[in-house]
Regions:
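Short, charged, surface-exposed hinge/linker loops at domain edges
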Residues: 1-5, 34, 38-61
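Central antiparallel beta-sheet cores of small beta-barrel/beta-sandwich binding domains
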Residues: 29-33
Length: 61
């Protein structure tokens, strides 16, 4: 569950955006491609931890 697929794209203004494919709405901006990916993965872990804390079943990703 720790190997997330992150789609990345460079915005017109030069910022990078990374979106975790298996978790809709989990996306993050970064100044570089690597930063956007790292931030998106970190956010994905936070979202999963929150779901677990609230007793929501987390399917294998």
């Amino acid at each position: 569950m720790s190997d997330f697929t992150v789609e990345i794209e460079c915005e017109i203004d030069g910022r990078w955006i990374g979106e975790v494919v298996d978790l809709p709405g989990v996306l993050a901006y970064g100044a570089s491609r690597d930063e956007a990916v790292a931030k998106a993965k970190a956010l994905a872990f936070r979202v999963l931890a929150d779901r677990i804390e609230r007793g929501i079943t987390v399917a294998d990703l």
